Amino acid sequence: MANIKAKKYYSYAKINLFLHILNKRTDGYHNLQTWFTFLDLKDQLTFSFNNSREINISSNISIAAKQDNLVYKAIKKFQQSYRVQDIGVDIEIKKNIPMGAGLGGGSSNAATTLIALRDYYLPQLSNEEMIPLAAKLGADVPIFVYGKSAWAEGIGEILYHKDFSPQYALLIKPDIHISTKEFFTSEDLIKSSVLISKDLGFDKSIMHNDFENVFYAKYPEFSQYLKELDSDFRMTGTGSCFYLLSADKNKLEQLARKINKSLDKWLVKTLNYVY
C-alpha cells in the first residue's frame, strides 16, 4: 500500500453540449444521450490518509451532512465494492465550482474521491473498471472517472470518447433553481424520441437540452434576458447555469461586461482531458 499524505487532486466542472431525455426505464431512471466536455473551472480536494479509521470531511463552504454527502457515499461504496476495511482519511474540499448549477461539482468530487482511494488502496485498478461503481453514485459521476470528453448514453455510464474543439465559455448563473423531480414531471418537458448518431459533429440545430423548455416556461423573464444577450446561450444539465461558447475570447469578455451584476459569471475554457 502506498504511503500518501496530504495529496492534492483537482476536480473539474463539466458542461453538457446537449442533453436529450429518452424513454423511462424499468428501474425508474431515464435513458439519455449527451455529449460531455470539461471546463478549467475546478475544485481542489486534499486527501490525508491515516490510521484513525475515521472519515472527516471539511470545506471552505457549508456542505451536506455525511450521510447526504456524495464524497462520503463514494467512500462507503468503494469500501463495499472492493472490500476495503478501516479507511481513515481527512478530506479538505476547496470549492470553486458553484453548487446547483448543472456543472457537476458534487459528482466530480465523488469521482475524484474514488480515484484518490484507488490510488492509495488499489493502484492496479483502472479508471474504466470503476465506471460501474461510479454509476451507482449518480448519472454524472462516470464521466468524471472517465476523464475525457465523451458521448454518453444509457443513464450516463455508456461512454464513447469524443473530443470537442476547444472553446472559451462564458457561464451565467442566476439565483434560481428547479429540482430534478420538477423537471421530469413538468408538462413543459418534451422528451426526445429519436436517437442521434454519436458520429455526428456538434450541430446546434438538432442538439439541444430538453430541460430548457421547462426552465424557460417557469422563468420567462430570464429567458428573454438571455435571448437579448445572445440567442446561443445553452443550459447545462438541469441548470441553473447557462453557457455561451466561442473561439473569440474578446467577444465573450465584452459580453460579460454587459451582464447584470446580480448574476454570477465566469469566463473559462473547455478541456478534452482532465487526467
From Swiss-Prot:
Annotated ATP binding sites: 98-108
Enzyme class (EC, first level): transferase
Gene Ontology BP, a term: isopentenyl diphosphate biosynthetic process, methylerythritol 4-phosphate pathway
A Pfam family annotated for this UniProt entry: GHMP_kinases_N
Entry's EC annotation: 2.7.1.148
Function: Catalyzes the phosphorylation of the position 2 hydroxy group of 4-diphosphocytidyl-2C-methyl-D-erythritol.
Family membership noted in the UniProt record: Belongs to the GHMP kinase family. IspE subfamily.
Protein name (record): 4-diphosphocytidyl-2-C-methyl-D-erythritol kinase
